[in-house]
Swiss-Prot record:
The keyword DNA-binding applies. It is found in: Nucleus. Keywords: DNA-binding, Metal-binding, Nucleus, Repeat, Transcription, Transcription regulation, Zinc, Zinc-finger. The gene is ATbp. This is AT-rich binding protein. InterPro entries: Zinc_finger (IPR050331), Znf_C2H2_sf (IPR036236), Znf_C2H2_type (IPR013087). The keyword Protein transport does not apply. Residues 110-142 are annotated as: Disordered. Its main location: nucleus. GO terms for molecular function: DNA binding; zinc ion binding. GO terms for cellular component: nucleus. It comes from Drosophila pseudoobscura pseudoobscura (Fruit fly).
Length: 375
C-alpha cells in the first residue's frame, strides 16, 4: 500500500509523517515527529507504529485529500478510543486512521518562502560586494590619477627650475660682456719709465689706477677703460700736460672717438705701451664665469672669443667655459662623482642625482655637502 508524498522543488519527497531525502542513488527517511533517520520504508512504518502509536490503514481508508490534520486525529484518539480486555492481559486497540494533513502544501510553501528569502539575501550580499569592489576600484583610480598629477607637477617644477637656472646663467653671461666703466684716479709712471719715454721722444700719459690715491689731479676729461669680451681691449688715456699743439690733440681725439673699429689706440712709446697693457690685464675685473685654466689652454677664434677644446682622442668639441668641458670629459672617463647618501648610487651628472632623489627617496633638491665643488 502506497503512502502519500509531495515532490518539492529542492528534490525532497515529503510524506505526511516523514521526509524522503535523496542523495544520488541512495535515500533515507526522516521522521517528522522525532527527526530520526530510517533507511527503508518498512523501518519507517514500524517506527511510527511502535514509537508514535500510529496505525496504517487499520479501520478504513482515507483519501489523500482528507480535510483533517494530525492534531485532529490525536484528539479523536484521546476521546473515542475503544478498549477491550482479553484474559489475564489486556490489549488496547485504538482504531485511528492514517492522518493526512489538510495543510500538506504547507511544507512546500514554507520551503519556497525560505528559498526566496535565502536567494534575496544572496542577491543583496552579491550587490553589496559588487558595490564595494566598484568603490575600491574608483579609489584606486583616484589614487593613481593623484600620483600621476604629483609626478607631472614635480617634473614641471624641475623643468621650471632648470629653465630659471639657464636664464640666470645666460643673463650672467650677457652681463659679463657689458663694457665696464672705471673712473679711478690717475697713476703717474715711475721716473725710470718717464726717462725712457723722454729719451725716445714719446708723449707721456698718466694711466688709470684701480687703487685709491691721496689727491687725484683734476683731469680735463674722464679716463676710462673699456673691456669687452667679444672685442679687442681699447685703452684710452688723457694726458694732464700736453706739450704738443692744440691741433695735434684734436687729431688724436678724432682718432679715438670717431673710429668705430675695435683697435688699440695709444700715443706712447714701446715701453709705455707694454706697461699699460700689463696694468690693464692685471687690474681688469674677472668674469664671473671665467675659468681657472691658463690662457694657453684656451684657443682663440677669429671673432676674438676663447674656446676650450676637448683633447680626448678625436672628440674635438668646443666649449666656452672650462667647467663645461670638464663635465663633458666625464663622458669619456666614465667617472661618477655624484653619489646618493641614502642608497650609494652614483651618477655622472647632478641632474641625474636630483631626479633619482625625487623618484626613489621622495626628496627635493640636492644637499650641498654631497655634491663636489663646482669648477
Amino acid at each position: 500500500m502506497g503512502f502519500p508524498r509531495i515532490l518539492s522543488k529542492n528534490n525532497k519527497i515529503y510524506t505526511k509523517l516523514g521526509e524522503f531525502c535523496l542523495s544520488g542513488d541512495s535515500f533515507w527517511i526522516v521522521c517528522h515527529t522525532c527527526q530520526e533517520e530510517l533507511q527503508t520504508q518498512d523501518q519507517f512504518w514500524k517506527h511510527i507504529q511502535d514509537e508514535h502509536n500510529f496505525l496504517h490503514g487499520v479501520a478504513k481508508e482515507h483519501s489523500r485529500t482528507s480535510s483533517y490534520c494530525l492534531t485532529d486525529v490525536e484528539a479523536a484518539a484521546a476521546t473515542s478510543g475503544a478498549t477491550t480486555s482479553q484474559g489475564a492481559g489486556s490489549v488496547t486497540s485504538v482504531t485511528v486512521p492514517l492522518a493526512l494533513y489538510h495543510c500538506s502544501t504547507k511544507y512546500s510553501e514554507d520551503d519556497q518562502r525560505e528559498m526566496d528569502i535565502h536567494e534575496a539575501q544572496q542577491q543583496q550580499h552579491q550587490q553589496q560586494q559588487q558595490h564595494q569592489q566598484q568603490q575600491q576600484l574608483q579609489q584606486q583610480q583616484q589614487r593613481d590619477v593623484a600620483k600621476e598629477l604629483a609626478e607631472l607637477h614635480a617634473n614641471a617644477v624641475a623643468v621650471a627650475s632648470a629653465a630659471a637656472a639657464a636664464a640666470n646663467e645666460s643673463s650672467t653671461r650677457s652681463s659679463s660682456g657689458i663694457d665696464i666703466k672705471i673712473e679711478p684716479p690717475c697713476l703717474t709712471l715711475p721716473p725710470e719709465m718717464q726717462a725712457a719715454a723722454a729719451a725716445s721722444n714719446a708723449t707721456i700719459y698718466h694711466l688709470p689706477q684701480l687703487g685709491p690715491a691721496a689727491v687725484p689731479p683734476p683731469p680735463p676729461t674722464t679716463g676710462f677703460v673699456s673691456a669687452n669680451v667679444s672685442t679687442s681691449t681699447t685703452v684710452s688715456t688723457t694726458p694732464p700736460n700736453v706739450t704738443g699743439s692744440h691741433s695735434v690733440m684734436q687729431q688724436q681725439a678724432g682718432v679715438l672717438t670717431g673710429s668705430g673699429l675695435s683697435t688699440l689706440s695709444m700715443s706712447v712709446g714701446p715701453s709705455t705701451a707694454m706697461a699699460a697693457a700689463l696694468l690693464s690685464t692685471q687690474e681688469l675685473p674677472k668674469d664671473s664665469n671665467s675659468t681657472t685654466a691658463s690662457a694657453g689652454s684656451a684657443v682663440s677664434s677669429d671673432d676674438g672669443e676663447r674656446w676650450y677644446i676637448c683633447d680626448y682622442e678625436t672628440c674635438g668639441l668646443k666649449f666656452k667655459y672650462k667647467s663645461r668641458m670638464e663635465l663633458h670629459r666625464v663622458v669619456h672617463s666614465k667617472e661618477r662623482r655624484f653619489n646618493c647618501e641614502l642608497c650609494s648610487a652614483s651618477f655622472k651628472q647632478s641632474c641625474n642625482l636630483s631626479t633619482h632623489r625625487k623618484k626613489k627617496h621622495a626628496l627635493r633638491g640636492i644637499k650641498s655637502e654631497i655634491l663636489p665643488q663646482r669648477f
